[in-house]
From Swiss-Prot:
Pfam families: Spin-Ssty (PF02513). The gene is Ssty1. Gene3D superfamilies: Spindlin/Ssty (2.80.10.70). This is Y-linked testis-specific protein 1. GO terms for biological process: gamete generation.
Length: 232
């Protein structure tokens, strides 16, 4: 493909992206010598600091994928599925506001029927789906999305006492950490590298990091030269 065609493709993709947030999509996925698989998802958002990256929630999967939908070579036959999705209104706006920024215990049921509690932090409501919340966990710092209002009312989510909701900062505020590269050392001594791409408005010490070659976003509390999370 000529450089001119590449430039045109990037320009067209950028223009299209502004119109597909909140839309359902389908595409094929081909990685290496693995068989081609088929996927359907909803586009939740664009990353404010890098609009070519999309927050994508695939059907039946709770973790959030962050992908360059129009330039990732593994994505084939990308289609926007009509019509645009209509989302339900939040029934308890007060509870929704109270959850954001809070540390919580989230109860899950294992395949064998036993229960386990995971400690996490509610980061934000999903902008286009207010009944869906971004959340991350101490044992797994990836970004997830769940319908937490239902879980709370069913007794499967509890706000941890003495952790008041954080005061949301302005989205216009800038932060010197955004755009910086970070180095992460695993328990086995190997390293991976990533970039700080976003500061969580409700928790100013919490940041999203996109590691090189990874299709997920990871959530860390950052202080100078330290990532305050359990190493994976």
């Amino acid at each position: 493909m000529s450089s001119l065609m590449k430039k045109r493709r990037r320009k067209s993709s950028s223009n299209t992206l502004r119109n597909i947030v909140s839309c359902r999509i389908s595409h094929s996925w081909k990685e290496g010598n693995e068989p081609v698989t088929q996927w359907k998802a909803i586009v939740l958002d664009q990353l404010p600091t890098n609009p070519s990256l999309y927050f994508v929630k695939y059907d039946g999967i709770d973790s959030i994928y962050v992908l360059e939908l129009y330039s990732d070579d593994r994505i084939l036959n990308l289609k926007v599925l009509p019509p645009i999705v209509v989302f339900p209104q939040v029934r308890d706006a007060h509870l929704a506001r109270a959850l954001v920024g809070r540390a919580v215990q989230h109860k899950f049921e294992r395949k064998d029927g036993s229960e386990v509690n995971w400690r996490g932090v509610v980061l934000a409501q999903v902008p286009i789906m207010k009944d869906l919340f971004y959340i991350t966990y101490k044992k797994d710092p990836a970004l997830y999305a769940y319908q937490l209002l239902d879980d709370y009312k069913e007794g499967n989510l509890h706000m941890i006492p003495d952790t008041p909701p954080a005061e949301e900062r302005s989205g216009d505020d800038s932060d010197v950490l955004i755009g910086n590269w970070v180095e992460y050392t695993r328990k086995d001594g190997s390293k991976k590298f990533g970039k700080v791409v976003y500061q969580v408005l409700a928790n100013p010490s919490v940041y999203f990091i996109k590691f090189h070659g990874d299709i997920h976003i990871y959530v860390y509390t950052m202080v100078p030269k330290i990532l305050e999370v359990e190493k994976s």
